[in-house]
């Protein structure tokens, strides 16, 4: 009987530890899943040297797409966060640079991390970010304001996708979360 209680206690402890591990790992695992599959409008990350050089060699049409920017914060994140430009017009295959502004109005340092997506969702696989603040955590000191860049391009392969022929605007949206809440 004592062995059964000990086995049950070990089993309960193992299940509890596993559940806690899954809860901490779910956000990064979901982000990786979305990045690999393009699920949920997740953008692609470009390799600057290979992708940009390939783009310069490819014949590009003069198609212009309007990229709109959106910025939100979670309910528990006290930052003020917004895009500096509301929208820009981007020629397919050419790089573009946009900025978001984040302000920490509190009296303590806060570390934030952002999630992002693209709408319409099917455009996510063609939206390639070369450099982005979303690739790592951001620490803002008390009352600090920073401008954060997003360097990107829209893959010319979008021109070959018949489902994307009527798309003339894409929205890039970020939501910042307090790292302590994750």
UniProtKB/Swiss-Prot annotation:
It comes from Reclinomonas americana. It is a single-pass membrane protein. The chain crosses the membrane at residues 8-28. The lineage of its organism: Eukaryota, Discoba, Jakobida, Histionina, Histionidae. InterPro entries: CtaG/Cox11_dom_sf, Cyt_c_oxidase_assmbl_CtaG. It is found in: Mitochondrion inner membrane. This is Cytochrome c oxidase assembly protein ctaG. Residues 29-182 are mitochondrial intermembrane. One of its GO terms (cellular component) is mitochondrial inner membrane.
């Amino acid at each position: 009987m004592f062995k059964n209680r000990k086995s049950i206690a070990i089993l309960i402890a193992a299940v509890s530890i596993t559940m806690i591990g899954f809860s901490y790992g779910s956000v990064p695992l979901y982000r990786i899943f979305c990045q690999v599959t393009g699920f949920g409008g997740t953008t692609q990350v470009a390799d600057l040297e290979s992708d940009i050089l390939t783009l310069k060699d490819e014949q590009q049409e003069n198609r212009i797409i309007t990229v709109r920017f959106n910025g939100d914060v979670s309910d528990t994140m006290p930052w003020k966060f917004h895009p500096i430009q509301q929208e820009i017009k981007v020629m397919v295959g050419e790089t573009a640079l946009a900025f978001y502004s984040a302000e920490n109005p509190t009296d303590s340092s806060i570390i934030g991390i952002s999630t992002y997506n693209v709408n319409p969702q099917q455009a996510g696989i063609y939206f390639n970010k070369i450099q982005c603040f979303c690739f790592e955590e951001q620490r803002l000191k008390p009352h600090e304001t920073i401008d954060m860049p997003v360097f990107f391009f829209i893959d010319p392969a979008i021109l070959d996708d018949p489902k994307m022929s009527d798309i003339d605007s894409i929205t890039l949206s970020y939501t910042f979360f307090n790292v302590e809440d994750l």
